Amino acid sequence: ISLLNRLESEGFSDEVYGLFKKSLETLAQLHIKGDEGLDYNNCLTNKEFGKQAIMADLLYFKYYFLDALRKPYDKQKLIDDFEALSNYLTHTEYKYFMFRDFQSRNIMVRNNEPFFIDYQGGMKGAPQYDVASMLWQARANLPDEWKNSLLEDYMNAFENIIGQAI
């Protein structure tokens, strides 16, 4: 059963929160430890999540979400924001293994332990991308309190592994 299935059946319970937290703590380990010695030449798509891939994902969001809403927005400001975000993500000093599709539907739960599936999009990239994918996934619709707490949980786990503040 997936973490998303658990969320849908149990709601925003303490147990489900614990599974999200454990998933993000395990993700921090995999980001860092999974990067060590990994030959990114063997990646299925790209070796690294660069600016073009980031812009493609952001434009996908624009076309299939924002434009589908048919609500007015400042298109130039949005593109400027996309440009700034893609620059930030490509110039971060923290680049590790990145899933690229890290969402609760790709986390299986067995005996209250999370197991990750769907690695084919993995490459070197900014770990923030996976964390954002998890916290802001549309189908989960996590409450803001959960997002803030889970982000803090992830950052604490990441800092503990690398031994310094981020």
Regions found by a protein language model. Name each.
Residues 59-68, 127-164:
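Active-site activation/catalytic loop segments of kinase-like enzymes and analogous catalytic loops
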Residues 27-31, 84-131, 138-142:
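Active-site acidic catalytic loop and adjacent metal/ATP-binding pocket
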Residues 35-47, 52-53, 57-97, 159-165:
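An alpha-helical support segment within catalytic cores of ATP-dependent transferases
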Residues 22, 26-29, 60, 84, ...:
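Alpha-helical elements of Rossmann-like donor-binding domains used by nucleotide-donor carbohydrate transfer enzymes
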Residues 21, 52-59, 122-125, 145-148:
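Alpha-helix N-cap/helix-start motif at coil-to-helix transitions, marked by capping-box chemistry
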Residues 7-13, 28-39, 97-108, 156-166:
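Short charge-dense sequence patches
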Residues 1-56, 67:
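ATP-binding pocket architecture of kinase catalytic cores
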Residues 13-20, 75, 140, 144:
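Flexible, glycine- and charge-enriched loops at secondary-structure boundaries
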